[in-house]
Amino acid sequence: MSFRLWGRCIFFFCFLLEAIDSRGGRRGGKGKGKSNLQFAQVAEFSLVQTVLSDNRSAQIITGSHFSQTYRLGYKLLIICKARGDPRPTIKWYKEGAEIQPKASIHYYEKPIENDTIWSKLEVDPATMGDQGVYACVANNPHGVMAKNFKAEYTY
């Protein structure tokens, strides 16, 4: 991927971080548990760069629900599926930083067809620190597309 495209990706994630609302507090309504979600205005899909008339560009075709709620100590699971020609690669980000696998964080990829890939991000056990904005970024030489997920914990 060219330096210019990476620059646009970094700009996109910086823009995403600026959109995070710093006001905390409880979520309205009745129900069990408390929400400490510290962001509010996050777009679900972001088209970073693509030629719209080019059907070969990376496109996220399905994924987990935009707003994820997880219980502390249990598994947080996010799924993303992308298509393009050539088959795109998928990278996972949290708050704009690329996620690196570690003891409690794993991601898996599975090619489905010549032009499609499926990826799953697992955080197990999930903690308060795992709350935030996650992004699945699909990339191929013809374009980049991102799908955001808001994850918040409950007791």
From Swiss-Prot:
Record InterPro entries: Cell_Adh-Cytoskel_Orgn, Ig-like_dom, Ig-like_dom_sf, Ig-like_fold, Ig_sub, Ig_sub2
Origin species: Caenorhabditis elegans
A Pfam match: Ig_3
Tissue specificity field: Expressed in body wall muscle cells, the pharyngeal muscle cell pm6 and in four head neurons.
One GO cellular component term: neuromuscular junction
Role: Required for the localization of acetylcholine receptors at neuromuscular junctions and for subsequently controlling the response evoked by receptor stimulation.
Signal peptide positions on this chain: 1-22
UniProt note: phenotype after gene disruption: Disrupted localization of levamisole-sensitive nicotinic acetylcholine receptor subunits in 80% of mutants, and this is mostly in conjunction with the disrupted localization of the associated transmembrane protein lev-10 and secreted protein lev-9. This results in increased sensitivity to the acetylcholine agonist levamisole.
Official protein name in the record: Immunoglobulin domain-containing protein oig-4
SMART domains linked to this entry: IG, IGc2
Location of this chain's protein in the cell: Synapse; Secreted
Key words of the record: Disulfide bond, Glycoprotein, Immunoglobulin domain, Secreted, Signal, Synapse
UniProt cross-references to Gene3D superfamilies, sorted A to Z: Immunoglobulins (2.60.40.10)
Disulfide bonds listed in the record: 80-136
Domain Ig-like C2-type: 73-154
Outcome of swapping residue 84 to R: In kr39; the mutant protein is intracellularly retained in body wall muscle cells and not localized to neuromuscular junctions
Glycosylation site positions: 55, 114
Keyword Transmembrane helix among record annotations: no
Oligomeric and partner information: Interacts with the non-alpha subunit of nicotinic acetylcholine receptor unc-29 and lev-10 to stabilize the complex formed between unc-29 and lev-10.
